[in-house]
């Protein structure tokens, strides 16, 4: 019965998404369709409305709109050029200087803006012209830009990790933020390895001359105000000075002060940023509320228990189960955005992982890492197609190089999946778990 209900949910969800129905409505309709055989329609609709309201009224949810607003302000604040110069001053002597600079800057910019697509667009456009002048293959630079754009979604502050905290029933945001650093750095390092190998093969050199400490100092001072946002907000949250919600509000104030000091926005552009952020936040908040319906339906019909029994019926080896889950998440992430996928798969797979002793922290990083790979994979792959557009190239030319990045990034996923310390060492060291 439970497996049949799950198949109904997935089938209805896929059909509605194929027809172009917004993901929030598709989740609600598919969930209600699955439960109508068990309870009365009026009761189902009333309960669904209550669950949606409860999901949207969580105080901790306000952190997401604030971080979205702070990210959009910073995105318009002209910080990309400062970060590119800062990373170039550090990594510029490596082979393929512009490739590794792109990777390092994407990690920093993605963490600040909270958007892989924004990182791919802002940083990629900064790197593109210089890469063209130095004879870099546009397909190589586009692939590097796209592949590295999602590393910032793992490095805090991360809306994806906040969403997972809500979906998992209140996992510590501070612990998740601390846990995100090593997986995010692993992603960036995997990309750097591929980038350097490509640079050596294709003959892309580093910047000539000796390491310039003076230039590094100048670039650090110019980038420090932007980097301080991460230090102040994350340091305050992890140190217990303020909560994630309070930290998100502080991030907005900090971003506003910085943007006005840089004179990169005015009142007119600020209003547009606020409106755009409100639209984006409205979609996310409503999606979180609607996902409560799905969680209720799964719990009512005991779907997680049935899925666990099904997987354990195939094998009792937890490593094989984790591999199966990774494959499911990787495939799902290719056609589903990160936020709805987190809300759908957390109630489905988290109980299974907890049954063999995995922490909610580790599962959260496995989940987000998988879905970030989907964000750079066709057919949807938002960050991938932004990178291709910015790079002025085509999917067919980029994919051979993307395959190399996929191999390296998935190797990083296996580290996150099978070595708990990758996700838990820092939170444990900081006394957060």
Where are these regions (language model features)?
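Alpha-helical transmembrane segments of multi-pass membrane transport proteins
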Residues: 1-433
């Amino acid at each position: 019965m439970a497996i049949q209900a799950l198949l109904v949910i997935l089938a209805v969800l896929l059909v509605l998404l194929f027809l172009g129905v917004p993901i929030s409505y598709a989740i609600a309709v598919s969930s209600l369709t699955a439960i109508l055989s068990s309870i009365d329609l009026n009761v189902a609709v009333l309960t669904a409305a209550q669950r949606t309201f409860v999901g949207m009224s969580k105080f901790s949810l306000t952190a997401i709109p604030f971080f979205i607003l702070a990210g959009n302000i910073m995105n318009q604040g002209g910080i990309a050029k400062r970060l590119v110069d800062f990373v170039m001053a550090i990594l510029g002597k490596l082979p393929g200087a512009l490739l590794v600079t792109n990777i390092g800057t994407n990690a920093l910019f993605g963490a600040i803006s909270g958007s892989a697509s924004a990182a791919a667009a802002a940083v990629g456009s900064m790197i593109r012209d210089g890469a063209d002048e130095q004879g870099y293959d546009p397909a190589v630079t586009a692939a590097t830009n796209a592949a590295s754009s999602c590393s910032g979604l793992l490095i805090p502050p991360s809306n994806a990790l906040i969403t997972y905290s809500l979906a998992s029933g209140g996992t510590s945001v501070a612990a998740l933020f601390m846990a995100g650093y090593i997986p995010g750095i692993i992603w960036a390092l995997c990309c750097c390895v591929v980038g350097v190998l490509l640079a050596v093969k294709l003959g892309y050199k580093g910047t000539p001359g000796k390491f310039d400490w003076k230039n590094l100092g100048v670039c650090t001072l110019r980038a420090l105000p932007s980097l301080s946002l991460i230090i102040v907000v994350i340091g305050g949250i992890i140190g217990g000075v303020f909560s994630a919600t309070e930290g998100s509000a502080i991030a907005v104030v900090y971003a506003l002060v910085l943007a006005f000091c840089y004179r990169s926005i005015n009142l007119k552009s600020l209003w547009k940023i606020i409106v755009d952020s409100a639209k984006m936040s409205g979609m996310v908040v409503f999606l979180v509320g609607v996902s409560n319906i799905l969680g209720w339906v799964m719990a009512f019909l005991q779907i997680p228990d049935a899925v666990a029994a099904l997987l354990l019926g195939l094998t009792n080896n937890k490593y094989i189960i984790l591999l199966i889950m990774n494959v499911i998440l990787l495939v799902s992430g290719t056609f589903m955005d990160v936020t709805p996928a987190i809300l759908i798969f957390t109630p489905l797979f988290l109980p299974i992982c907890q049954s063999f002793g995995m922490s909610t922290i580790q599962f959260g990083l496995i989940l987000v890492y998988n879905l970030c790979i989907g964000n750079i994979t066709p057919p949807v792959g938002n960050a991938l197609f932004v990178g291709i557009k910015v790079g002025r190239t085509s999917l067919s030319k980029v994919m051979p190089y993307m395959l190399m990045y996929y191999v390296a990034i998935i190797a990083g996923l296996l580290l996150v999946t099978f070595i708990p310390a990758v996700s838990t060492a820092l939170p444990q060291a900081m006394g957060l778990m």
